[in-house]
Amino acid sequence: MTNTRKSHPLMKILNNAFIDLPAPSNISSWWNFGSLLGICLILQILTGLFLAMHYTPDTTTAFSSVAHICRDVNYGWIIRYMHANGASMFFICLYMHVGRGMYYGSYTFLETWNIGVILLFAVMATAFMGYVLPWGQMSFWGATVITNLLSAIPYIGTSLVEWIWGGFSVDKATLTRFFAFHFILPFIIAALAMVHLLFLHETGSNNPTGISSDTDKIPFHPYYTIKDILGALLLILALMLLVLFTPDLLGDPDNYTPANPLNTPPHIKPEWYFLFAYAILRSIPNKLGGVLALVLSILILILMPLLHMSKQRSMMFRPFSQCLFWILVANLLTLTWIGGQPVEHPYIIIGQLASITYFLLILVLMPMASMIENNLLKW
């Protein structure tokens, strides 16, 4: 008798993806973040759905509706803070996942990697639009500043910005469309994530050594299901510690002031997970140049396979590249810190140096280190 798990048209797909999937025997905890991202996405969709039941996307009532959710809706406060802090956990997992891919050379799976970059952009767009919805001061001014960047595009810029706004400023039309997009995008992300997995399962997973995984495979269940459950428990623990003890730790106090177009906050800054890109944007005195640098800071990931000069896939046995990788991590943390600081001395010059270092490391220094390591192998 055939097993239903293996014969049923729908169960067969799930079985081949999560149960009988051959997985490398030596993948470390850095390979847990894929499943954690899936959990984050499901959590965000569920909490977001319940928030949408009580939220009103209208400039006059949006701020009040969020206050109403926190005060009057049963467990509304926990749903709201799980959603807000869930976004932070999502980005922590995302950056860890991308960093793992860079360190272990996973970008050589071209289709998987490129879908991943598209996913990153989609999640960033979703998070940005979600931040606008509570209609606090930072929501309004963040939306104004970031959408205004598109006006730097020659010839069509101004028309494009007004088209996105649905008027001559960020107003009711903007809020309504941002809510619509914020609702639909996570489902598009879920579909893209399935394509991401589809392409990954065509090749199988990479492993820390960077050599072929085919020599030693084990079934995904029970080995990696139990490992993923442990990861999930730690993720939920971290999220709930944040939500229940310091729910506003990562937020901006300005967002507890209702949006006021006549009063500009002294320091306009996005959520912490965009600060590194914001620092790169601000470090260039030219508007168009800043916008290009901002986009390229993420789009540069597409070039990773082209910039791979090493004869080895992973950085596991490449000390020079490892050193540069961790300098890049430190550099990104520096940019994150600078993005949250006011535009004044010495932060301006630190931001400019960190921005130059960021592009220099990825485009020049890391490929050069790879080539030096290749020559060392000849001995």
From Swiss-Prot:
Species whose genome carries this gene: Bubalus quarlesi (Mountain anoa)
Keyword RNA-binding: no
Names of required cofactors: heme b
Localization annotation: Mitochondrion inner membrane
Protein name stated in the entry: Cytochrome b
Lineage: Eukaryota, Metazoa, Chordata, Craniata, Vertebrata
Domain of life: Eukaryota
Residue sites binding heme b b566 per the record: 97, 196
InterPro entries the UniProt entry points to: Cyt_b/b6_C, Cyt_b/b6_C_sf, Cyt_b/b6_N, Cytb/b6-like_sf, Cytochrome_b, Cytochrome_b_C_euk/bac, Cytochrome_b_N_euk/bac, Di-haem_cyt_TM
Entries under PROSITE patterns matching the protein: CYTB_CTER, CYTB_NTER
